[in-house]
Amino acid sequence: MARFRGSITKVSRRLGIALSPKAEKYLERRPYAPGEHGQSRRGKVSEYALQLREKQKMKYLYGVLEKQFRIYYKKAVAQRGVTGDNLVKMLERRFDNVVYRCGFSPSRAGARQLVTHGHMLVNGKKVNIPSFLVSPGDQIEFRQKSRNLDAVADSLNKAAESRIPEWIQVDKANRKAVFLAIPEREAVQEPFNEQLVVELYSK
Protein backbone atom coordinates (compact mmCIF):
# COMPACT_ATOMS: atom_id res chain seq x y z
CA MET A 1 0.00 0.00 0.00
CA ALA A 2 1.20 3.53 -0.77
CA ARG A 3 2.61 5.56 2.08
CA PHE A 4 2.78 9.26 2.85
CA ARG A 5 5.95 10.69 1.29
CA GLY A 6 5.80 14.31 2.46
CA SER A 7 7.39 16.03 5.44
CA ILE A 8 6.26 14.40 8.68
CA THR A 9 7.76 17.33 10.58
CA LYS A 10 5.55 19.85 8.76
CA VAL A 11 2.48 17.69 9.29
CA SER A 12 3.35 17.36 12.98
CA ARG A 13 3.60 21.13 13.35
CA ARG A 14 0.34 21.65 11.50
CA LEU A 15 -1.53 19.14 13.68
CA GLY A 16 0.30 20.05 16.87
CA ILE A 17 1.42 16.49 17.67
CA ALA A 18 4.74 14.67 17.30
CA LEU A 19 4.52 11.98 14.64
CA SER A 20 8.16 10.94 14.95
CA PRO A 21 11.11 11.41 17.34
CA LYS A 22 12.55 14.01 14.95
CA ALA A 23 9.25 15.89 14.83
CA GLU A 24 9.12 15.91 18.64
CA LYS A 25 12.39 17.87 18.74
CA TYR A 26 11.12 20.35 16.14
CA LEU A 27 7.88 20.90 18.06
CA GLU A 28 9.83 21.76 21.18
CA ARG A 29 11.56 24.56 19.27
CA ARG A 30 8.68 25.63 17.03
CA PRO A 31 5.33 24.73 18.60
CA TYR A 32 3.26 26.36 15.87
CA ALA A 33 2.08 25.64 12.33
CA PRO A 34 4.61 25.88 9.47
CA GLY A 35 4.67 28.73 7.01
CA GLU A 36 5.06 32.50 7.09
CA HIS A 37 1.95 33.03 9.21
CA GLY A 38 2.26 29.96 11.40
CA GLN A 39 2.62 31.87 14.67
CA SER A 40 -0.18 34.33 13.94
CA ARG A 41 -3.00 32.02 12.83
CA ARG A 42 -5.97 32.75 15.03
CA GLY A 43 -9.73 32.93 14.80
CA LYS A 44 -12.59 30.56 15.35
CA VAL A 45 -12.14 27.07 13.95
CA SER A 46 -15.21 25.47 12.37
CA GLU A 47 -16.68 22.22 13.66
CA TYR A 48 -15.80 20.53 10.38
CA ALA A 49 -12.19 21.71 10.61
CA LEU A 50 -11.91 20.29 14.14
CA GLN A 51 -13.34 16.96 13.04
CA LEU A 52 -11.06 16.81 10.02
CA ARG A 53 -8.00 17.61 12.13
CA GLU A 54 -8.78 14.77 14.54
CA LYS A 55 -9.13 12.37 11.62
CA GLN A 56 -5.79 13.53 10.24
CA LYS A 57 -4.18 12.99 13.64
CA MET A 58 -5.38 9.39 13.76
CA LYS A 59 -4.41 8.64 10.16
CA TYR A 60 -0.91 10.05 10.48
CA LEU A 61 -0.25 8.61 13.94
CA TYR A 62 -1.07 5.09 12.81
CA GLY A 63 0.24 5.53 9.26
CA VAL A 64 -3.04 4.71 7.54
CA LEU A 65 -4.25 6.24 4.28
CA GLU A 66 -7.85 7.37 3.71
CA LYS A 67 -9.14 4.28 1.91
CA GLN A 68 -8.03 1.87 4.61
CA PHE A 69 -9.02 4.23 7.41
CA ARG A 70 -12.56 4.34 6.02
CA ILE A 71 -12.61 0.53 5.91
CA TYR A 72 -11.63 0.45 9.58
CA TYR A 73 -14.42 2.88 10.36
CA LYS A 74 -17.04 0.77 8.55
CA LYS A 75 -15.89 -2.31 10.46
CA ALA A 76 -16.04 -0.35 13.73
CA VAL A 77 -19.64 0.65 12.98
CA ALA A 78 -20.59 -2.97 12.29
CA GLN A 79 -19.19 -4.21 15.59
CA ARG A 80 -20.99 -4.15 18.93
CA GLY A 81 -20.07 -1.40 21.34
CA VAL A 82 -18.96 2.20 20.92
CA THR A 83 -17.85 2.94 17.35
CA GLY A 84 -14.97 5.21 18.37
CA ASP A 85 -13.64 2.68 20.86
CA ASN A 86 -13.85 -0.08 18.25
CA LEU A 87 -11.91 2.06 15.78
CA VAL A 88 -9.08 2.74 18.22
CA LYS A 89 -8.88 -0.92 19.23
CA MET A 90 -8.48 -2.02 15.61
CA LEU A 91 -5.75 0.52 14.98
CA GLU A 92 -3.93 -0.61 18.11
CA ARG A 93 -4.04 -4.21 16.87
CA ARG A 94 -2.20 -3.38 13.64
CA PHE A 95 1.01 -5.38 13.50
CA ASP A 96 3.24 -2.37 12.83
CA ASN A 97 1.71 -0.56 15.79
CA VAL A 98 2.21 -3.56 18.08
CA VAL A 99 5.87 -3.81 17.03
CA TYR A 100 6.22 -0.11 17.91
CA ARG A 101 4.45 -0.58 21.25
CA CYS A 102 6.87 -3.40 22.08
CA GLY A 103 9.74 -0.92 21.88
CA PHE A 104 11.32 -2.73 18.94
CA SER A 105 11.37 0.55 16.99
CA PRO A 106 11.33 4.21 18.12
CA SER A 107 8.59 5.06 15.61
CA ARG A 108 5.66 3.41 13.85
CA ALA A 109 7.31 4.15 10.51
CA GLY A 110 10.39 2.24 11.62
CA ALA A 111 8.21 -0.59 12.92
CA ARG A 112 6.46 -0.74 9.55
CA GLN A 113 9.83 -1.19 7.85
CA LEU A 114 10.74 -4.04 10.18
CA VAL A 115 7.49 -5.75 9.22
CA THR A 116 7.60 -5.14 5.46
CA HIS A 117 11.26 -6.19 5.24
CA GLY A 118 10.37 -9.57 6.71
CA HIS A 119 12.14 -9.29 10.06
CA MET A 120 9.11 -10.17 12.21
CA LEU A 121 7.28 -13.38 13.12
CA VAL A 122 3.84 -13.97 14.62
CA ASN A 123 3.47 -17.34 16.33
CA GLY A 124 6.59 -18.55 14.53
CA LYS A 125 5.46 -17.53 11.04
CA LYS A 126 6.74 -14.59 9.00
CA VAL A 127 4.19 -11.81 8.62
CA ASN A 128 5.16 -8.87 6.41
CA ILE A 129 1.79 -7.11 6.29
CA PRO A 130 1.69 -3.99 8.52
CA SER A 131 -2.13 -4.04 8.68
CA PHE A 132 -2.28 -7.61 9.99
CA LEU A 133 -4.42 -7.58 13.14
CA VAL A 134 -2.74 -9.14 16.15
CA SER A 135 -4.95 -11.17 18.53
CA PRO A 136 -4.66 -11.82 22.28
CA GLY A 137 -2.12 -14.55 22.96
CA ASP A 138 -0.15 -13.96 19.77
CA GLN A 139 3.62 -14.14 20.18
CA ILE A 140 5.69 -11.57 18.32
CA GLU A 141 9.39 -12.06 17.75
CA PHE A 142 12.25 -11.39 15.36
CA ARG A 143 13.51 -13.88 12.84
CA GLN A 144 16.67 -15.51 14.16
CA LYS A 145 18.96 -13.62 11.77
CA SER A 146 17.29 -10.28 12.58
CA ARG A 147 17.54 -10.37 16.38
CA ASN A 148 20.83 -8.53 16.60
CA LEU A 149 20.02 -5.59 14.33
CA ASP A 150 21.77 -2.51 15.71
CA ALA A 151 18.66 -0.34 15.31
CA VAL A 152 16.58 -2.78 17.37
CA ALA A 153 19.13 -3.00 20.18
CA ASP A 154 19.35 0.79 20.30
CA SER A 155 15.58 1.17 20.39
CA LEU A 156 15.18 -1.37 23.20
CA ASN A 157 17.93 0.30 25.22
CA LYS A 158 16.15 3.64 24.94
CA ALA A 159 12.62 2.33 25.46
CA ALA A 160 11.54 3.16 28.99
CA GLU A 161 9.59 0.46 30.81
CA SER A 162 6.78 2.98 31.26
CA ARG A 163 6.40 3.24 27.47
CA ILE A 164 5.58 -0.44 27.05
CA PRO A 165 1.82 -0.76 27.70
CA GLU A 166 0.25 -3.18 30.13
CA TRP A 167 -1.39 -5.21 27.37
CA ILE A 168 1.99 -6.29 25.98
CA GLN A 169 4.63 -8.41 27.74
CA VAL A 170 8.14 -7.93 26.38
CA ASP A 171 11.22 -10.13 26.76
CA LYS A 172 13.94 -7.71 25.70
CA ALA A 173 16.80 -10.17 26.01
CA ASN A 174 15.23 -12.61 23.56
CA ARG A 175 13.55 -9.99 21.35
CA LYS A 176 10.12 -11.47 22.00
CA ALA A 177 6.73 -10.21 23.14
CA VAL A 178 3.22 -11.46 23.82
CA PHE A 179 0.10 -9.48 22.96
CA LEU A 180 -1.85 -10.14 26.14
CA ALA A 181 -5.14 -8.38 25.42
CA ILE A 182 -6.90 -5.83 23.25
CA PRO A 183 -6.58 -2.56 25.18
CA GLU A 184 -9.56 -0.68 26.49
CA ARG A 185 -9.93 2.78 25.02
CA GLU A 186 -9.03 4.62 28.22
CA ALA A 187 -5.70 2.79 28.34
CA VAL A 188 -4.60 4.16 24.96
CA GLN A 189 -2.92 7.50 25.64
CA GLU A 190 -2.91 9.27 22.28
CA PRO A 191 -3.69 12.95 21.53
CA PHE A 192 -6.84 12.59 19.44
CA ASN A 193 -10.60 12.63 19.92
CA GLU A 194 -12.05 9.75 17.91
CA GLN A 195 -15.61 10.83 18.69
CA LEU A 196 -15.14 13.85 16.42
CA VAL A 197 -14.05 11.45 13.68
CA VAL A 198 -17.22 9.41 14.19
CA GLU A 199 -19.26 12.60 13.90
CA LEU A 200 -17.44 13.50 10.69
CA TYR A 201 -18.16 10.17 9.01
CA SER A 202 -21.73 10.11 10.31
CA LYS A 203 -22.73 13.18 8.32
UniProtKB/Swiss-Prot annotation:
UniProt source species: Chlorobaculum parvum (strain DSM 263 / NCIMB 8327) (Chlorobium vibrioforme subsp. thiosulfatophilum)
What are this entry's molecular-function GO terms? rRNA binding; structural constituent of ribosome
Keyword Lipid biosynthesis in record: no
Matching entries from Pfam families are given as: Ribosomal_S4, S4
- Which InterPro entries has this protein been placed in? Ribosomal_uS4 (IPR022801), Ribosomal_uS4_bac-type (IPR005709), Ribosomal_uS4_N (IPR001912), S4_RNA-bd (IPR002942), S4_RNA-bd_sf (IPR036986)
Single Gene Ontology BP term? ribosomal small subunit biogenesis
- What cellular component terms from Gene Ontology apply here? small ribosomal subunit
Query: Is rRNA-binding there in the keyword field?
Result: yes
What keywords tag this UniProt record? Ribonucleoprotein, Ribosomal protein, RNA-binding, rRNA-binding
Q: Which domain of life does this protein belong to?
A: Bacteria
| Recorded name of the encoding gene | rpsD
Q: What is this protein called?
A: Small ribosomal subunit protein uS4
